[in-house]
Amino acid sequence: MAPKKAKRRAAAEGSSNVFSMFDQTQIQEFKEAFTVIDQNRDGIIDKEDLRDTFAAMGRLNVKNEELDAMMKEASGPINFTVFLTMFGEKLKGADPEDVITGAFKVLDPEGKGTIKKQFLEELLTTQCDRFSQEEIKNMWAAFPPDVGGNVDYKNICYVITHGDAKDQE
């Protein structure tokens, strides 16, 4: 496979769910920005595209280290879907779903996909950015525990990263 085709195939692995995060107008605006940055029009933003974009904005002599750091923010080649995903994650201010799920899994050594309501509530009200009683009340309204007092953290992770509750099957 030619190197350019391999790049495109790897880039195609970006999340397609990102398109549901934005309305059509926003997607079009991101597409226009992507097109401006993709200076050589190959459908992939690379280090030279970034360098050329900075030059077009009057910022010459951008250090390679700075460009490398920008490129490393993506997991691979930056096609439009990856570009949109990166902005979606930045704008939402949330970590990717697998990172959030991984954090919950630490609290679920048996791997059941649930955490006891009482334990989660204690953590949320006593650690780091503590939840208020109002926030706890809202959380249980949105994610009610089952009859055994267990909370489905996979659903919480999905809602944090996608914005809507996952259909229960």
UniProtKB/Swiss-Prot annotation:
The modification N,N,N-trimethylalanine is found at A2. It comes from the Eukaryota. Ca(2+) binds at D38, N40, D42, D49. The modification Phosphothreonine is found at T25, T35, T101. InterPro entries: EF-hand-dom_pair, EF_Hand_1_Ca_BS, EF_hand_dom, Myosin_RLC. The keyword Cytoplasm does not apply. One of its GO terms (molecular function) is structural constituent of muscle. GO terms for biological process: immune response; muscle contraction; skeletal muscle tissue development. PROSITE patterns: EF_HAND_1, EF_HAND_2. Pfam families: EF-hand_6. Keywords: Calcium, Metal-binding, Methylation, Motor protein, Muscle protein, Myosin, Phosphoprotein, Repeat. Transmembrane segments: none annotated. The modification Phosphoserine is found at S15, S16, S75. GO terms for cellular component: cytoplasm; myosin complex. Residues 25-60, 95-130, 131-166 form the EF-hand domain. Myosin is a hexamer of 2 heavy chains and 4 light chains. This chain binds calcium. Myosin regulatory subunit that plays an essential to maintain muscle integrity during early development. Plays a role in muscle contraction. PANTHER family: MYOSIN REGULATORY LIGHT CHAIN 2. This is Myosin regulatory light chain 11. It comes from Rattus norvegicus. The lineage of its organism: Eukaryota, Metazoa, Chordata, Craniata, Vertebrata. The gene is Myl11.
